[in-house]
Amino acid sequence: MHDAPAQRKRRRPGRIGPLPRSSRFARLKLLIASACAALLATLALPPGAAHAQTVTSNQTGNHNGYFYSFWTDAPGTVSATMGSGGNYSTSWRNTGNFVIGKGWSTGGRRTVTYSGSFNPSGNAYLTLYGWSRNPLVEYYIVDNWGTYRPTGTFKGTVTTDGGTYDIYQTTRYNAPSIEGNKTFNQYWSVRQQKRTGGTITTGNHFDAWARAGMQLGSHDYMIMATEGYQSSGSSNITVGGTSGGGGGGGGGGGCTATLSAGERWDDRYNLNVSVSGSSNWTVTMNVPSPATILSTWNITATWPSSQVLVARPNGSGNNFGVTIKHNGNWTWPTVSCSTG
């Protein structure tokens, strides 16, 4: 409730000169006090509050340097607040299904770091979440969950970042996706022991999936997500990270090389390499034995040894590719990039 505004005092007729000195001094003190009060109010705001954005409807966008995605099939039961940098918070009550998070508009081999809190009551996941196209795949690297631990067709395990993850594959039929209602596979890495915070080296999961015959296509978005289903709860997560996680990317000296999957056959596979940060670059690729490189395109290639490729631009742009004969080793090569 607000008090009724006081009536404005009318100015005395005939006064057109300056205010008396005592009145001017009182007015100056009032202005200083008001400025101090405004400053203190600003300082009292929680970090990021001045840049916070509340989201309650399905959308994607960019906020404070990070991509975000908000999707729900039950509007009105979940909301998110986009905080400073990679921070976001969620609150949901008796919801249907939702996925909310911050990350990157284009995923890939990244070393993702995150911290925060995750407090579900019912079925929910705290997960690195993303999509690829051609093939269309929805993937999860699950670090924490509520009452239900996701499962599926067991494909093996991968040990990375201080823990062991079980690998599963499932299929969804005529379900919502980034390409509309489609039938598509889901890939899962589910940590055996829950945690809320740490590092996720995505390339190690991608390599383990590939060894199990679970191939990704070209990356769409990737977010550190909170997902809930017929549950209630809250989360507050801050995400960060760098490109080149695991065996598939590297940077230094002003450029970064990032690997992504190409076509795959029984005995060999293609990798695409994208270079950013410079058009005058040198990429060094180290191939794990006994795998070998069969061919390359869009580069000038030299071979310091049978397991090392040095690639330089040949006028075809900043993207090139290689065909690798795996010889029983499906682990992707590592790459590093330097300018000049």
Curated annotation (Swiss-Prot):
Residues 1-52 form the signal peptide. Residues 1-20 are annotated as: Disordered. Transmembrane segments: none annotated. It is found in: Secreted. It comes from the Bacteria. Endo-acting xylanase which specifically cleaves internal linkages on the xylan backbone, releasing xylooligosaccharides. Is able to hydrolyze oat spelt xylan and birchwood xylan, releasing xylobiose and xylotriose as the major products. It catalyses: Endohydrolysis of (1->4)-beta-D-xylosidic linkages in xylans. The keyword ATP-binding does not apply. The gene is xynBS9. Keywords: Carbohydrate metabolism, Glycosidase, Hydrolase, Polysaccharide degradation, Secreted, Signal, Xylan degradation. Its main location: secreted. Belongs to the glycosyl hydrolase 11 (cellulase G) family. Coiled coil: none annotated. Is inhibited by Ag(+) and Hg(2+) in vitro. EDTA and other metal cations such as Na(+), K(+), Ca(2+), Cu(2+), Mg(2+), Fe(3+), and Zn(2+) have no effect on catalytic activity. Optimum pH is 6-7. Its EC number is 3.2.1.8. Residues 54-239 form the GH11 domain. It is an enzyme of class 3 (hydrolase). One of its GO terms (biological process) is xylan catabolic process. The active site is at E138, E227. One of its GO terms (molecular function) is endo-1,4-beta-xylanase activity. This is Endo-1,4-beta-xylanase B.
